[in-house]
Amino acid sequence: MGRVRTKTVKKAARVIIEKYYTRLGNDFHTNKRVCEEIAIIPSKKLRNKIAGYVTHLMKRIQRGPVRGISIKLQEEERERRDNYVPEVSALDQEIIEVDPDTKEMLKLLDFGSLSNLQVTQPTVGMNFKTPRGAV
């Protein structure tokens, strides 16, 4: 099993990544040198722990957003995703197939006047009332 990282190591690594993201990478040794240059870390052992956690977080950041770390690049990416407008609206299709429940919801939202709605019966999925041993 691995070791538990202290609050000091985690906070220091997060701050270093937020401020110096462009200088860091997936290599422990380069991250160790960057940590040594930018921060006053009292001991070699603590510096290595922080650099190791920085490397771990950098690998996680490459896979996707990491909770507790906001990086300008990720913020811009999220803004772009939130402001996305499709070229063709889903309502501009010739026929929109909906089930009766969806039709009712659209009526409640004042979209009942859409002329291209076609109500279809939903396909029956899994039957959950069968006993466990039966096939």
Curated annotation (Swiss-Prot):
One of its GO terms (cellular component) is nucleolus. Gene3D superfamilies: Ribosomal protein S17e-like (1.10.60.20). Coiled coil: none annotated. Keywords: Cytoplasm, Isopeptide bond, Nucleus, Phosphoprotein, Ribonucleoprotein, Ribosomal protein, Ubl conjugation. Signal peptide: none annotated. One of its GO terms (molecular function) is structural constituent of ribosome. The modification Phosphoserine is found at S113. It is found in: Cytoplasm; Nucleus, Nucleolus. It comes from the Eukaryota. Ubiquitinated at Lys-103 by RNF14 and RNF25 in response to ribosome collisions (ribosome stalling). There is a cross-link at K103 (Glycyl lysine isopeptide (Lys-Gly) (interchain with G-Cter in SUMO2)). The modification N6-succinyllysine is found at K19. The modification Phosphothreonine is found at T130. Component of the small ribosomal subunit. Part of the small subunit (SSU) processome, composed of more than 70 proteins and the RNA chaperone small nucleolar RNA (snoRNA) U3. Component of the small ribosomal subunit. The ribosome is a large ribonucleoprotein complex responsible for the synthesis of proteins in the cell. Part of the small subunit (SSU) processome, first precursor of the small eukaryotic ribosomal subunit. During the assembly of the SSU processome in the nucleolus, many ribosome biogenesis factors, an RNA chaperone and ribosomal proteins associate with the nascent pre-rRNA and work in concert to generate RNA folding, modifications, rearrangements and cleavage as well as targeted degradation of pre-ribosomal RNA by the RNA exosome. Belongs to the eukaryotic ribosomal protein eS17 family. This is Small ribosomal subunit protein eS17. It comes from Oryctolagus cuniculus (Rabbit). The lineage of its organism: Eukaryota, Metazoa, Chordata, Craniata, Vertebrata. The gene is RPS17.
